[in-house]
Curated annotation (Swiss-Prot):
It is a single-pass type I membrane protein. Its main location: membrane. Keywords: Membrane, Signal, Transmembrane, Transmembrane helix. It comes from Mus musculus (Mouse). This is KANTR integral membrane protein. Disulfide bonds: none annotated. Disruption phenotype: Homozygous mice have tremors and a propensity to develop spastic movements upon handling. The gene is Kantr. The chain crosses the membrane at residues 35-55.
Length: 76
């Protein structure tokens, strides 16, 4: 594993931890707020952002490997 891959995994882990804590706080906000539509919108944006960030980091980490190319050949 290269140092760049390790750095990407560390950034991914910390960003996932941060976004999970943020979404937990937003779900608590959803319970106690009067404008629930805005809180629900914020919660969905944070969730979609975290999923897309993790997917992109995994994709770019696996892109150079030959195993990933083999998987692409199998599914496409």
């Amino acid at each position: 594993m290269s140092p760049f891959s390790l750095l990407i995994l560390v950034i991914c882990a910390f960003s996932l931890f941060f976004l999970i804590n943020l979404s937990r706080g937003l779900s608590i906000l959803l319970v106690f707020t009067k404008n629930q539509l805005l809180a629900l919108l914020l919660l969905s944006i944070v969730s979609l952002f975290s999923i897309s960030l993790i997917s992109a980091l995994i994709f770019f980490d696996l892109l150079p490997s030959t195993f990933f190319g083999f998987i692409l050949l199998l599914f496409f």
